[in-house]
Amino acid sequence: KVKYIPCSLDLNRFKLKTSEWPKKIALGWTGTFSSKHYLDSIRDVLYEVDKYLDIKIILITNFDYSLEGLDYEVIRWRESSEISDLHKIDIGLYPLIQTNWALGKGGLKALQYMAAGIPAIATNFGTVKDFITHEKNGFLVDSTKQWVNAIKMVAENTKLRNNIIINARNTVETNYSVSSNEKKYL
């Protein structure tokens, strides 16, 4: 008998972000060089959003990256600072390119954002459709225009943003935490 066990996070590690919503919004992406092409796929989104909102881009990664003309920071990923680095992000971005390879991705980064109290915006493709319900616990987007609109909605609508944060954390606690899945392992 085969049983699917989803990505599972230790919520004792992934504490909720508690800081106030800033005037300058930090859009964040986390990933390695092997997933750089996903970040490249939303470059235009970042430049477009910068026309409407006061933003900073936070990239948590293992490689150098340039976003000339934008306010951005590259933070080297380290396990010891992973959570505190994630807490520098206000909106988490999880872009994918629609390929067979991407279908196999488990959506871990989006789940990490959700667990940490960071609203997640993801490409409407693959596994994320199993755990993100659009405008309830995150956003699923298909185009540059939808990326931009979702970022603006999260930034400008406090009630929606707060509901997404609460619902996202509940989703992870209920279905994607170690404690919710431990019986499946044993």
Language model regions located:
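Short acidic/histidine- and often glycine-rich active-site loop of Leloir-type glycosyltransferases
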Residues: G104, N124-E135, F139-L140
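Donor nucleotide-sugar binding/catalytic pocket of nucleotide-sugar-dependent glycosyltransferases
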Residues: K1-K15
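Short hydrophobic beta-strand element within catalytic cores of glycosyltransferases
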Residues: Y94, Q112-A115, P119-A122
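Short Ser/Thr-rich beta->loop micro-motif in glycosyltransferases that lines
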Residues: Y94-L103
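A short, well-ordered alpha-helix in the C-terminal region of glycosyltransferases
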Residues: M153, L160-N175, N181-K184
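Conserved acidic donor-binding segment of nucleotide-sugar-dependent glycosyltransferases
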Residues: H134-K145, M153-K159
